[in-house]
Regions:
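Extracytoplasmic/lumenal domain signature
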Residues: 1-14, 18-206
Length: 206
């Protein structure tokens, strides 16, 4: 689903993707391949991957649906239930885990502001980072933009993406937010409304 190098050269990955009935079973893992193994492979050397690949197994019903973001603090991964800051420490070290709310991959009705008609069961927004913040959207009614403290995972701000929608319009977010940090305490964001661009049929019981 997604791969990204962290600042230490470890390669983080998330497997899984979009699925019907996510509560039925655990699907996919998140983890990393140690830089030492990658360097060895690139140098044409033999390496024991059983000692270089580390995974964090998600619980049944939880899965990654978005891209990974890397910072000097670690790798930020958003699942349909939690946002994680993970660090490579001879294994996957969970620095923090922040749960968030989601209405799920439901079919939107008239006037509904959730992500019905989108792809993700959780927030469809890959995390966007500033030096101090992690930003992503949830999948509530209405859909909110959340800002988490990079060091602690605490939610420091939350605001509806659009809090005054015309009748019959919905919000669905399936892309990363555009973020600008002016370095003086002001962070500006642009969030794209993806609603109407496609429906994977994840809420269809058939």
């Amino acid at each position: 689903l997604s791969v990204v190098f962290d600042y230490d050269g470890n390669l983080w990955f998330a497997t899984g993707g979009f699925r019907i009935y996510p509560q039925r079973q655990q699907q996919g893992v998140i983890g990393y391949i140690a830089r030492s193994a990658i360097d060895a492979i690139l140098n044409g050397e033999q390496t024991d991957l059983s000692k270089a690949v580390f995974v964090y197994e998600l619980t049944p019903g939880e899965g990654a649906e978005n891209g990974i973001a890397a910072s000097k603090d670690g790798a930020v991964i958003l699942t349909n239930q939690n946002c994680y800051l993970l660090r490579a420490e001879e294994g996957v070290d969970v620095v923090w885990r922040t749960p968030y709310e989601s209405a799920g991959a439901k079919v939107s009705g008239e006037g509904d502001k959730t992500t019905g008609g989108g792809l993700a069961w959780g927030g469809g927004c890959s995390p966007t980072l500033t030096p101090n913040l992690v930003l992503f959207t949830d999948n509530q009614d209405p859909v909110n933009l959340l800002a988490l403290d990079m060091k602690t995972g605490e939610v420091v701000a939350s605001t509806p993406v659009l809090d005054d929608l015309p009748e019959g319009y919905q919000v669905a977010v399936e892309n990363s937010a555009i973020v600008y940090d002016d370095g003086n305490g002001t962070v500006s964001t642009i969030v794209c409304n993806w609603f109407g661009a496609g429906n994977a049929g994840l809420a269809d019981p058939n």
